[in-house]
Regions:
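Acidic (Asp/Glu-rich) sequence patches and key acidic residues
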Residues: 7-159, 165-167
Length: 167
């Protein structure tokens, strides 16, 4: 059985980002120099966290433009979505949360490849852009472009990355 990955269901996520204003993405890198947090993304990364959440929920039968965007990436762009499914709440409440958060580390190169694919889709694919806009994530491209730049050097060095979010 695969480990639980993704957002805990503690709050309802609306299709509007008004309820996500307080969401902040944390991107951590682990390499020979230790663990460090990368700079914050534009908008705190709220649009990217929403995309991650909907990408993770795509197999549950829900309908949302960001779920459709994830499916479009998988089917039409042949993008592996697994790297987008490895994130967790960044403030553990117990030992189980701590263990799950620790299991979210992944190769930075794999996340970089997925982020590059998402960025290319949002930059060049009219349907991809439209789905992001309909999903109330107009800031997604700016966040993904910033993350792409932040991941370039750690990915080239073989570092690991962990995505988490804070409410």
């Amino acid at each position: 059985v695969a480990p639980h990955r993704g957002v805990k269901r503690r709050r309802t996520v609306s299709t509007s980002f008004d309820s996500l204003e307080a969401v902040r993405l944390r991107v951590e890198i682990a390499d020979e120099d230790g663990v460090r947090e990368l700079p914050e993304l534009p908008g705190g990364g709220a649009a990217f966290v929403a995309f991650l959440s909907f990408a993770l929920a795509r197999g549950l039968g829900g309908q949302h433009p960001l779920i459709a965007l994830a499916e479009h990436l998988r089917r039409e762009h042949r993008l592996r979505l697994g790297p987008f499914e490895r994130f967790y709440e960044g403030v553990p409440e117990d030992e189980e949360d701590t263990a799950l958060l620790e299991r979210m580390w992944q190769p930075a190169a794999e996340l970089e490849e997925a982020v590059n694919g998402l960025a290319a889709c949002l930059e060049r694919d009219e349907l991809g852009r439209a789905l992001a806009e309909r999903g109330a994530a107009p800031g997604l491209l700016a966040e993904v472009a910033a993350l792409r730049e932040l991941l370039r050097e750690p990915a080239a060095r073989g570092a690991r990355v962990r995505l988490s979010y804070e409410l």
